[in-house]
Amino acid sequence: FTHPHYETEAVYNSTNDVDLYATAVSNYFQGNHKKSIENMKRLINKHPSNPFYNELLGEIYFANNDYKSATFYHEAAINNIEKVNDLYYMMMGNYLWTFEETNKSTEAILNLKKSLLINSENAYAWYLLSRAYAQTGSISLANYATAERYFLIGERELSYEFAVKASKQIEENLSLIHI
């Protein structure tokens, strides 16, 4: 927003949709998440299929470490948006990864892969994917994802090191299968 918080509150002071949304965002930036959540829930009750309302409410819940609510509303955003972009899947992967549960990490990996299928040059999605793989114990895949990330940000030497490490780990795992 281009206005200070007090101006936003003064200008957008009714209960119409624009005012509720403006004050929800302004309060979110001010750290007044309770007011933001109240406004967003009112908007979602009026417009349950609006993906942008669901996305913002999910983001607010995530900022408050309420990962269950964050994923619920973000999933609603994904299901209601006309065309999902890579960032929606990346955010969902991030939300799921924070649960620190293997089944949620597996879901996170699926969402992050969807994100990377749309935009393989998103270095942060590769970073999140490496973290999710590590959380599930798939260290070779975590190292591969890290190599991709370093390649994208121009760290060729680190990229090569992680690619070699991933390759060696994959070879070791394959040799264990043949025993």
PLM features per residue range, with description:
Residues F1-K83, L110, L141, E155, ...:
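Extracytoplasmic and endomembrane cell-envelope/extracellular-matrix remodeling and assembly machinery
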Residues I177-I179:
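Conserved small/polar residues in nucleotide/adenosyl-binding loops
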Residues Y144-E171:
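TPR/TPR-like (Sel1-like) alpha-helical repeat modules
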Residues L117, E121-Y124, S138-I139, L152-L158, ...:
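Short helix/loop segments within enzyme catalytic domains
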Residues L43, A77, K114-S115, R149, ...:
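Canonical positions in the second alpha-helix
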Residues I60-N65, E75-A76, I81-Q135:
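Alpha-helical adaptor scaffolds
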Residues T8-A10, R131-A134, S140, Y144, ...:
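Acidic, polar-rich low-complexity tracts and alpha-helical solenoid repeat scaffolds
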